[in-house]
């Protein structure tokens, strides 16, 4: 039977109705600060914790519930003779229910971090002071104590659990199985809360790879399935900005596991460019990329790169989608269109394709710099690395052949190099002016990628340029490229046979640039 409950919450959703039900059941309610005021204003009888303990709130509310009368009443084991004797001797009464949710540190941290990523002269100390005042101490202590003693204490951290708990109490009792599930939820919640704090401190003062690292993940929803229908899946969010998870889904079916993977890849590639760009992705690799004077021309060029592979793909734009572009897009089946926004006329066009997912992601109009680290799951752990981003990348580039690239070739080389970074290794990109024309993707041999990229081309490769994400180990790659009419190459260099490769390029009068930077992607 529930005789006494302690309630102290920041999130007051459903609070009053829940407390009224407890009041009707004759439960004595202890509370603090703003929660107590909310309950009293609603006509609910409340005892202040300070009155209950005989000790006032101190230090601007930093110390409110940290008292033996509170924690003894929570932690006492009802079936332990020594605990019961201690309660009787010290005048400690049992607390049977604890309802607590925590100061809104997460929202404060997210607000700060979204600003820290932009200006460089912000007052971090002012941010830190505000964040520190939103670090809850008493709340997690109450929750952890209650969850530890879940057999005797009902602990509620989620307002969504209020109604089911009331129903169970009215039926007679809350089962031990349900109490255990509530305790599990608490420990996950408090662990994430501490992880959010550690993550925030690290981001405002980075120290590289940490010895101990807990990711503050929160499930936003379950997904229909994973990569395949037999795999269960869910979507988890980090407290980061920008976040693809926060993108507005304007229409269409729910995003799938594969949709998110492909959209992520498309977004990262699209934000490499300041010019209007269209990126079409299929199975986590681009199949067409182009820049243009506007996104309509960019889309037409990107689509022409590989119309067959584009079917069922994902499109990313870094400009607002207009009616003209939308009218062109609906002629082909796509899974997702992601853009900074869609104008009203474009949305009306897309209404004819009800299942097509439209994602509004305003950050796409900017150069996105992913925060934190890039993680990849392996058996037993993670491998962690910095994101693949290099400032002033072309400042290290040098021409290693007799012939210099022309201005037009330089432009195409830089375009192809940006695309190549986002293709599975071994990657070879054939490009002409401002578009891809052939993509050699994910082959175990670089010369195979060179051959497959040429096979995919739907137009003549004469006068094209090529980008390779890794060095050419043998001259056979240059022979293949020359046979297909390539006039200029950009690659990292670094092979023991670099001179052999350079000599081959000179033989064919091909201009070649070494960047000194590799862009493998696995």
From Swiss-Prot:
Question: Does the UniProt entry include the keyword Glycoprotein?
Answer: no
* Lineage top rank: taxon: Bacteria
Q: Name one GO cellular component term.
A: cytosol
The protein's annotated catalytic reaction(s) are: (6R)-10-formyltetrahydrofolate + 5-amino-1-(5-phospho-beta-D-ribosyl)imidazole-4-carboxamide = 5-formamido-1-(5-phospho-D-ribosyl)imidazole-4-carboxamide + (6S)-5,6,7,8-tetrahydrofolate; IMP + H2O = 5-formamido-1-(5-phospho-D-ribosyl)imidazole-4-carboxamide
For this protein, what is any one GO molecular function term? Answer: phosphoribosylaminoimidazolecarboxamide formyltransferase activity
Task: Cite the InterPro entries for this sequence.
Answer: AICAR_Tfase_dup_dom_sf, Cytidine_deaminase-like, MGS-like_dom, MGS-like_dom_sf, PurH-like
State the PROSITE patterns in the record. Answer: MGS (PS51855)
The annotated pathway is:
Purine metabolism; IMP biosynthesis via de novo pathway; 5-formamido-1-(5-phospho-D-ribosyl)imidazole-4-carboxamide from 5-amino-1-(5-phospho-D-ribosyl)imidazole-4-carboxamide (10-formyl THF route): step 1/1; Purine metabolism; IMP biosynthesis via de novo pathway; IMP from 5-formamido-1-(5-phospho-D-ribosyl)imidazole-4-carboxamide: step 1/1
Annotated GO biological processes are: 'de novo' IMP biosynthetic process
MGS-like domain residues: 1-157
| Keyword terms, alphabetized | Hydrolase, Multifunctional enzyme, Purine biosynthesis, Transferase
For this protein, the Enzyme Commission number is 2.1.2.3, 3.5.4.10
Pfam families from the UniProt entry: AICARFT_IMPCHas, MGS
Q: Which family does it belong to?
A: Belongs to the PurH family.
What's said on domains?
The IMP cyclohydrolase activity resides in the N-terminal region.
- What is the protein's given name? Bifunctional purine biosynthesis protein PurH
| Annotated source species | Thermodesulfovibrio yellowstonii (strain ATCC 51303 / DSM 11347 / YP87)
The organism's lineage?
A: Bacteria, Pseudomonadati, Nitrospirota, Thermodesulfovibrionia, Thermodesulfovibrionales
């Amino acid at each position: 039977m529930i005789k006494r409950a302690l309630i102290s919450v920041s999130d007051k959703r459903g609070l009053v109705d829940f407390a009224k039900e407890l009041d009707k059941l004759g439960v004595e309610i202890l509370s603090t600060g703003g929660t107590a005021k909310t309950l009293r204003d609603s006509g609910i009888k409340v005892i202040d914790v300070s009155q209950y303990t005989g000790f006032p709130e101190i230090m601007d509310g930093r110390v409110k519930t940290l008292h033996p009368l509170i924690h003894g009443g929570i932690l006492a084991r009802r079936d332990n003779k020594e605990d019961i004797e201690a309660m009787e001797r010290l005048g400690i009464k049992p607390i049977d229910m604890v309802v607590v949710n925590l100061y809104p540190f997460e929202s404060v941290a997210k607000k700060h971090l979204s600003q820290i990523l932009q200006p460089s002269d912000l007052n971090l100390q002012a941010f830190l002071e505000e964040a520190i005042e939103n670090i809850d101490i008493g709340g997690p202590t109450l929750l952890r104590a209650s969850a530890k003693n879940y057999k005797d204490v009902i602990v509620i951290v989620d307002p969504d659990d209020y109604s089911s708990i009331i129903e169970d109490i009215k039926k007679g009792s809350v089962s031990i199985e349900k109490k255990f599930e509530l305790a599990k939820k608490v420990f996950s919640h408090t662990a994430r809360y501490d992880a959010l704090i550690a993550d925030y401190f690290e981001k405002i003062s980075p120290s590289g790879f940490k010895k101990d690292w807990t990711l503050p993940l929160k499930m936003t929803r379950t997904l229909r399935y994973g990569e395949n229908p037999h795999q269960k899946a869910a979507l988890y969010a980090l407290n980061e900005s920008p976040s693809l998870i926060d993108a507005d889904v304007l229409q269409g079916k729910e995003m799938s596991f594969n949709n998110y993977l492909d959209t992520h890849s498309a977004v990262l590639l699209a934000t490499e460019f300041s010019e209007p760009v269209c990126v079409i992705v299929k199975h986590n690799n681009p199949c067409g990329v182009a820049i243009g004077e506007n996104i309509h021309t960019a889309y037409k060029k990107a689509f022409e790169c590989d119309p067959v592979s584009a079917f069922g793909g994902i499109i990313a734009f870094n400009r607002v989608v207009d009616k003209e572009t939308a009218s062109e897009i609906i002629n082909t089946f796509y899974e997702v269109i992601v853009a900074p926004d869609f104008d009203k006329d474009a949305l009306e066009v897309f209404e004819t394709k009800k299942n097509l997912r439209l994602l509004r992601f305003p950050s796409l109009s900017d150069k996105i710099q992913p925060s934190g680290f890039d993680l990849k799951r392996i058996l037993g752990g993670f491998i962690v690395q910095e994101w693949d981003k290099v400032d002033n990348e072309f400042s290290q580039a040098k021409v290693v052949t007799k012939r210099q690239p022309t201005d037009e070739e330089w432009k195409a080389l830089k375009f192809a190099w940006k695309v190549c970074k986002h293709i599975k290794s071994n990657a070879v990109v054939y490009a002409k002016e401002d578009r891809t024309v052939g993509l050699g993707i994910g082959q175990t041999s670089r010369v195979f990628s060179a051959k497959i990229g040429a096979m995919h081309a739907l137009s003549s490769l004469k006068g094209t340029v090529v980008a390779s994400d890794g060095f050419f180990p043998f001259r056979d790659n240059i022979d293949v490229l020359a046979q297909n009419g390539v006039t200029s190459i950009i690659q990292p260099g670094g092979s023991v046979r670099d001179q052999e490769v350079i000599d081959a390029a000179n033989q064919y009068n091909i201009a070649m640039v070494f960047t000194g930077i590799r862009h493998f992607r696995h």
